[in-house]
Amino acid sequence: MPDTTYNPAAEGPRAAIARRILARATDGQPHLSAEIPGLMLIRMDQAHLNTCSVYEPCVALIVQGSKRIMLGEETLFYGEDRYLIAAMDLPVQAAVMQASAERPYLGVGMRLDWREIASLMLESPAPTTANGPLDNRAMTTGALTLPLLEAFDRLVALLDQPEHITALAPLVKRE
């Protein structure tokens, strides 16, 4: 069940990320270019049902809208209150559930390589859910925290200061 707890502090970073994605979405393409290696920015003006693709290892969040992802027999729903993490290449069917020209689907993500995943696993405490430790899924969602949202905001904000990307993007990405 999605966490529907409203956190007013999240609106500032969420709105800032949305503005930056919309400022770059000028050519009508859903996947926008970003000068930061591994950073993914996505805008869709209409719902799309059951698009087949392969998700690379990544952490992603939805700034506006919602999505359904089918991985084998499992269906994951996530929206503005959740984040998604994939630990390996996974074939999925994905559907953007909420999107319109007036309120487009906006997403942001960061590709991860196996070295980053291994390092994070060694240096971080084992992640948990409200019900205890996470299971061994290759893809899952979790409650979006303000620190994660703020880290994505700082990363996307670097696109407005390209002279700082080389020095700061790796630090924010690691965060």
Task: Walk through the language-model features, giving the residues of each.
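A short, N-terminal "cap"/entry segment at the start of jelly-roll beta-barrel domains
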Residues: 1-35, 39-42, 48-49, 132-136
